Design a protein with these regions (language model features):
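N-terminal glycine-rich phosphate-binding loop for ADP-containing cofactors
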Residues: 1-268
Length: 268
């Protein structure tokens, strides 16, 4: 049976939202994209071309795929422009209030397709609690960063009907991703592990270890170097996640600075 998803939408074009939209288009889906921030929309073409160039240098995308991608990656001036999508992925800030406002607006546009959220900390139950979303058409699909290079996607589908479950799972597999069913708990599997890892890395730094020592030790253990990873995280998102999870103290959180967002990284 062919998958009914042909056109997808993405709301929120930060680091992960942009890469998710890029992945959708790269895999042949018509991707309608929108962000409420004008700066995000204004920089969209430049970001797309920079990503294309990077993937071409690594031999991960052909010239024909590039031509198709440019046609399929379609900016929208508002949320109403996404209403025709068969599936919309919400990738806005880790804030339930903001997410619910997006869902309310989408409902007002007449959108009736499947809705997924890329949240890494807010539970599905929380987002369903106010009745804005149809639970039969709503799933949590948490991609991993960097989206274009990681395969696992955490999935929470709860009481969705079987046909919609199958549609979403097949869609993720078409993207070349491995859906992993996860319990609906704050932080899910990945962030539960990641936050413990992050706290311990910071504690080692406080105890006198050098950044390069911690990162090298992680590499020897076949783990992602923690401080190298921190420099790709957006501090505001980390703060939102840790507030929700209540697992990271403020003094540890203060170490999360990145070159992209603060003008300096851990090496500085």
């Amino acid at each position: 049976m062919s998958n009914p998803i042909k056109t997808v939408g993405v709301v929120g074009l930060g680091v992960m939202g942009f890469d998710i939209a890029f992945l959708y288009a790269m895999k042949g889906f018509r991707a309608l994209v929108y962000d409420a921030a004008k700066s995000m929309m204004d920089s969209l073409t430049d970001r797309r071309e920079q990503t294309i160039e990077r993937l071409q240098k690594r031999g991960r995308i052909t010239d024909q795929e590039v031509d198709n991608l440019r046609m399929l990656f379609i900016p929208s001036s508002d949320l109403a422009g996404l209403a025709e999508a068969d599936l919309i992925t919400e990738a806005v800030s880790e804030n339930a209030r903001i997410k619910l406002a997006v869902y309310k607006t989408l409902r007002e546009t007449g959108f009736h397709g499947l809705l997924t959220t890329n949240t890494s900390s807010v539970t599905r139950a929380t987002l369903l609690s106010v009745g804005t979303v149809n639970s039969q058409k709503f799933a949590l699909t948490h991609f991993f960063n960097p989206v274009l290079y990681t395969q696992m996607v955490e999935v929470v589908m709860g009481d969705m009907d079987s046909a919609n479950r199958e549609t979403i799972l097949e869609f993720l597999k078409t993207l070349g991703r491995e859906p992993v069913p996860t319990k609906d708990i704050s932080g899910f599997v990945s962030n539960g592990i990641l936050m413990v890892f992050a706290v311990m890395a910071v504690r080692l730094l406080e105890c006198g270890a050098r950044i390069e020592q911690v990162d090298q030790a992680a590499k020897e253990l076949k783990l992602l170097p923690p401080f190298f990873s921190f420099d790709s995280w957006k501090p505001s998102i980390v703060e939102d996640v840790t507030k929700i999870m209540r697992e990271l103290r403020g003094d540890a959180l203060s170490f999360y600075v990145t070159g992209e967002n603060r003008g300096a990284d851990f090496e500085d």
